[in-house]
């Protein structure tokens, strides 16, 4: 198991949004976090993604909230890889959701590349 660490950035853009910045060896991954917590309609999600993408190169969106799945965001109209995460807000949520990748080189940068390409699968408890 490889755990990638990062920081959650708070972005104030038409309300607040969270973006994870995950560091690899030489690369970084940016994820718009927990879509289910914002109460946004699809057109508003697209609007926020366009706005945030001007600040950070968004690579994926998180379709979980504190480890709980929000399948309503697993739609092709959101044209980003959709990632599951437990988001580690409380001990009860640790390990509830994760991603798995099958990479030849087991490096953080290889994992980041796989996520960008959507070459992973989500796991849930």
Indicate residue ranges for each PLM-predicted region.
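Charged catalytic cores and adjacent phosphate/nucleic-acid-binding surfaces used
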Residues: 1-5, 11-27, 37-125
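Acidic beta-strand-to-loop metal/phosphate-binding motif
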Residues: 31-35
